[in-house]
Amino acid sequence: MRRLLILPVLLMTFSFFSCSNGTSGEEQKTADTTAAVTPAPAEEKPAFTPFKLDYIQHRVKNFNTWEAGYLAHDSIRKAYGLTPFLLGRDMKDSNLVYVIDKMDDLAKAQQFAALPDLQKVMMKAGVISKPAFSYAEVIRSDDSPVETNDRVGVAHHVKDFNVWLKAFDAEGSATRMANGLADRMIARSLIDSNMVYITFAVTDMAKAKARITSPELKKIMTDAGVDSPPTLRWYHLVK
């Protein structure tokens, strides 16, 4: 008889805990569901670190022949701290080439430019003009994707870099974008820090050319202390 009384008690106890566990499972499921839809924190973009560039401009007989020679010379460039960064061809003269390499050290890059063998290699690759070298440090860079390989490089001298930069920022990237120019890069010459190089992606060619030659922009540049005629390089990125 006693065993018969104990059995219902055990059954009731089992049922109670079963119900309790079921409720906890629902609560856990709800909690898990809530946790699953919580958005993950956005990844922070790494802080920008300035870097140095070696700009080379020259004309070639045949681009493909020259490029093969350029690539074959890669190990020598690396020995002098130079690594390929960008390669462009002029819009009007596709055999006018703009080579931009990242560089570790200015002195080494200048030694590379003065190598007697370099002149021989360039001639063999079909370079038919005296190469022009420039060295700069990039202080701003935007490498976010853009749907164009068209670029314009603007080079000019300024009286005071900080005054110029303040005016550039006051003009604003939105204004430039509305005129077909997307900010990509600002660099300062390592030979003369008041020599400035600005690179834009060209999103609307007609608007960009109109803006760059406009009296409004000319006034902005004059007021900002630009004291040399700007040099413009319109080109297509190849790499």
Model region roles, listed by residue range:
Residues 20-239:
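Short S/T/G/P-rich N-terminal loop/turn motif that feeds into the first structured element of a domain
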Residues 1-2:
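N-terminal secretory signal peptides that target proteins for export/translocation
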Residues 5-13:
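Sec-dependent N-terminal signal peptides
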Residues 15-18:
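C-terminal motif of bacterial Sec signal peptides marking the signal peptidase cleavage site
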